[in-house]
Amino acid sequence: MTTNTVVREAQSQAEYNPLAKQKAAAKLSRIPIKVEHGEALKKPDWIRVKAGSPTTRFYEIKDILRANKLHTVCEEASCPNIGECFGKGTATFMIMGDKCTRRCPFCDVGHGRPDPLDTNEPLNLAKTIAELRLKYVVITSVDRDDLRDGGSGHFVECIKNIRELSPLTQIEILVPDFRGRDDRALEILKAAPPDVMNHNLETAPRLYKEARPGSDYQFSLNLLKKFKALHPKVPTKSGIMVGLGETDEEILQVMRDMRAHDIDMLTIGQYLAPSNSHLPVRRYVHPDTFKMFEEEAYKMGFTHAAVGAMVRSSYHADQQAHAAGV
């Protein structure tokens, strides 16, 4: 099989607009790696999503989100489970805009110079959650390397507003790594800690340079360990993708590293390339292998492990949390 190397030439200064949201090829043209593509692997039957007809609830949620100028990672990251989750009245809200300061080549969230924070967003988010009568919410964000606190203060404002309007709603936050600002961010989060603290490791350390440029494996592990030391009763959680070129043993070692850093909950799912411009799928992991990962997770002491081809970090997050005793 012949492998074609796609070398993405940098856009000229005249073409590049840092204020515009860049997606796919436009986003990845300026990263310092070569994205190599061979013949695309055929998707096996076990990873196909059952497409259902959009429900009234699906459209209701989309209308409410647009009316309140809110974003979901479900939409921005092209999650394959969006139909099911929206249809059941659940969503993962993405705060601080829809332009990320990073250019991870596995991710479909747009890149660009972020807009100033919307000071009305925490209240709008809280009103939306109350209107939808959600009992469990996940709040994530784009990376905001432009902010001195990495956006941690905005997370706190969102949590406070949600608890004011929906005191019984449980809140999971899926945070960026707060690169270089972790101690400041953790200090700020003390004002309103979540019910579950989630930060994804994404892949094995060997693949970080390719998959997570600008991030550091040990830094991400330490972020969750530091949070756990400050809030020992709050469950910590992390997720891994498979299919980027890692081995089974590398996944097991990441799991061991997670437990060594006091991470309680785990998600593992199959990586699916959002477009032909993104990192290609190197392998499709068989359900039997996912089952092995799940069994090993419980042997290692994880309180809950959601493992399977279509599992995503916030997929059935409420069920994951409740199974872990939240």
Swiss-Prot record:
<dbReference type="InterPro" id="IPR006638">
    <property type="entry name" value="Elp3/MiaA/NifB-like_rSAM"/>
</dbReference>
<comment type="pathway">
    <text>Protein modification; protein lipoylation via endogenous pathway; protein N(6)-(lipoyl)lysine from octanoyl-[acyl-carrier-protein]: step 2/2.</text>
</comment>
<feature type="binding site">
    <location>
        <position position="79"/>
    </location>
    <ligand>
        <name>[4Fe-4S] cluster 1</name>
    </ligand>
</feature>
<dbReference type="InterPro" id="IPR007197">
    <property type="entry name" value="rSAM"/>
</dbReference>
<feature type="binding site">
    <location>
        <position position="104"/>
    </location>
    <ligand>
        <name>[4Fe-4S] cluster 2</name>
    </ligand>
</feature>
<dbReference type="GO" id="GO:0046872">
    <property type="term" value="F:metal ion binding"/>
</dbReference>
<dbReference type="GO" id="GO:0005737">
    <property type="term" value="C:cytoplasm"/>
</dbReference>
<feature type="binding site">
    <location>
        <position position="85"/>
    </location>
    <ligand>
        <name>[4Fe-4S] cluster 1</name>
    </ligand>
</feature>
<keyword id="KW-0479">Metal-binding</keyword>
<feature type="domain" description="Radical SAM core">
    <location>
        <begin position="85"/>
        <end position="303"/>
    </location>
</feature>
<comment type="similarity">
    <text>Belongs to the radical SAM superfamily. Lipoyl synthase family.</text>
</comment>
<keyword id="KW-0808">Transferase</keyword>
<feature type="binding site">
    <location>
        <position position="314"/>
    </location>
    <ligand>
        <name>[4Fe-4S] cluster 1</name>
    </ligand>
</feature>
<keyword id="KW-0963">Cytoplasm</keyword>
<keyword id="KW-0408">Iron</keyword>
<protein>
    <recommendedName>
        <fullName>Lipoyl synthase</fullName>
        <ecNumber>2.8.1.8</ecNumber>
    </recommendedName>
</protein>
<dbReference type="InterPro" id="IPR013785">
    <property type="entry name" value="Aldolase_TIM"/>
</dbReference>
<dbReference type="InterPro" id="IPR003698">
    <property type="entry name" value="Lipoyl_synth"/>
</dbReference>
<keyword id="KW-0411">Iron-sulfur</keyword>
<keyword id="KW-0004">4Fe-4S</keyword>
<feature type="binding site">
    <location>
        <position position="107"/>
    </location>
    <ligand>
        <name>[4Fe-4S] cluster 2</name>
    </ligand>
</feature>
<dbReference type="Pfam" id="PF04055">
    <property type="entry name" value="Radical_SAM"/>
</dbReference>
<dbReference type="GO" id="GO:0051539">
    <property type="term" value="F:4 iron, 4 sulfur cluster binding"/>
</dbReference>
<feature type="binding site">
    <location>
        <position position="74"/>
    </location>
    <ligand>
        <name>[4Fe-4S] cluster 1</name>
    </ligand>
</feature>
<feature type="binding site">
    <location>
        <position position="100"/>
    </location>
    <ligand>
        <name>[4Fe-4S] cluster 2</name>
    </ligand>
</feature>
<keyword id="KW-0949">S-adenosyl-L-methionine</keyword>
<dbReference type="Pfam" id="PF16881">
    <property type="entry name" value="LIAS_N"/>
</dbReference>
<dbReference type="InterPro" id="IPR031691">
    <property type="entry name" value="LIAS_N"/>
</dbReference>
<dbReference type="GO" id="GO:0016992">
    <property type="term" value="F:lipoate synthase activity"/>
</dbReference>
